[in-house]
Amino acid sequence: MSTKTKSPIGQRTVIGFDFGKKYIGVAVGQEMTGSATPLGSVKATDGIPHWDNLAKYLKEWQPDFIVVGLPLNMDGSEQQLTLDAKKFGNRIHGRFGIQVEFQDERLTTADAKEQLFARGGFKNLKKDNIDAESARLIIESYFEQQYT
């Protein structure tokens, strides 16, 4: 996969990741609509993803770039998980050659849980759903920040 953007700005496809030490949520978004769809999650061991599973999403969706959520403290300062998420993004870029952007993800998990519960009650609050929904919110907040 190459770092060259395949699509014109405004028409690009983006994959978003909600980084976690055990699971990494995945979503896909389209710049044209400013919206994203949750896809699922990839298992990780101490923040290192099962790369083959992650690669399947990249191969299927052929993203023009990737957005990784940055788990900042509420005051905006970094924590160890923030540094781990940056390392994850840098590894993706090094491994697949795809441009990586970072997006503040404060409160996305709480928002994801609230939205999932509203749509399906407690049965909708599965870990996989929460991680993927968080990735969707990360992409959409990136679009809002960039294009509004």
Swiss-Prot record:
Record PANTHER family: POLYNUCLEOTIDYL TRANSFERASE, RIBONUCLEASE H-LIKE SUPERFAMILY PROTEIN (PTHR33317:SF4)
Superkingdom field: Bacteria
EC number: 3.1.-.-
Lineage: Bacteria, Pseudomonadati, Pseudomonadota, Gammaproteobacteria, Alteromonadales
Molecular-function GO terms, alphabetical: nuclease activity
Job of this protein: Could be a nuclease involved in processing of the 5'-end of pre-16S rRNA.
Location of the protein in the cell: Cytoplasm
TM stretches of this protein: none
Keyword Ribosomal protein listed: no
Protein name in UniProt: Putative pre-16S rRNA nuclease
SMART domains: YqgFc (SM00732)
GO CC annotation: cytosol
Entry keywords, A to Z: Cytoplasm, Hydrolase, Nuclease, Ribosome biogenesis
Pfam families tied to this protein: RuvX
Gene3D superfamilies: YqgF/RNase H-like domain
GO biological process terms, semicolon-separated: rRNA 5'-end processing
Primary location recorded for the protein, binned into one broad class: cytoplasm
Family: Belongs to the YqgF nuclease family.
InterPro entries: RNaseH-like_sf (IPR012337), YqgF (IPR005227), YqgF/RNaseH-like_dom (IPR006641), YqgF/RNaseH-like_dom_sf (IPR037027)
Enzyme kind, highest EC tier: hydrolase
